[in-house]
Amino acid sequence: MSVTVGISAASAQTQNVKCTYSATHVISDAVKGIEDAHIREIVIQKFQNDKKTFTMLYADGKYSFSEGSNKVDNGIKSIGLAGDIYIDMVKDSVFAQKYIVDKLFLIKDKYVPYDWTVTKEEKTINGKVCIKATTSGNIPVTAWFCTDIPLNVGPLGYLGLPGIIMQLDTPTYSYVLQEMVDLKDAPSFDVPTKGKVVTQEEFNKLEAEKIKSRGTEAGKVRIIRM
């Protein structure tokens, strides 16, 4: 698919932008290592069919990321899987929905920028040369950003790189930018309200405890209903 790009460096930070990201489920080593071949194939097929579309909006320091209207509950829930995210970079505030298995939490906290490590590695994504960057919190994340599009935004609330994130890889999903549209008018933003309210620190502790109790790393699938 092509990416619509028509944003100048001079005006990029004040543009009204709508981006569409596709997300595909990562087939983890744990899944590939399932001994029962029949069960392994069922799980892999379920993951391969788990394709999502997300919408990212950005305007005047406000940002949102949410799943599209084709949202379907496929029975798969992961630790740290995100729902809707809203960030006000002017007020340094964040409202983010995240799951721990099938329980929804609403993180309300001050926005803290990610600490990125930018590498010299490059690759081309949808015709754009991108640079690799990494960051880590409770889970490792790899971003491929494009300086030709100087918007410091990306999927899942990962912001702060000197170019839009064309691809974001987490242990659970890989997100790829498919379309970017320059909007004439500023979009409206929906602030998420559902979920048990916690701070980022409180969520990190709950997430770490759940990961430890399962005896596996973050990002692996916890519940599979068939």
Where are these regions (language model features)?
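Bacterial Sec-dependent N-terminal signal peptides
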Residues: M1-C19
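Extended soluble regions of mature proteins
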Residues: T14-M226
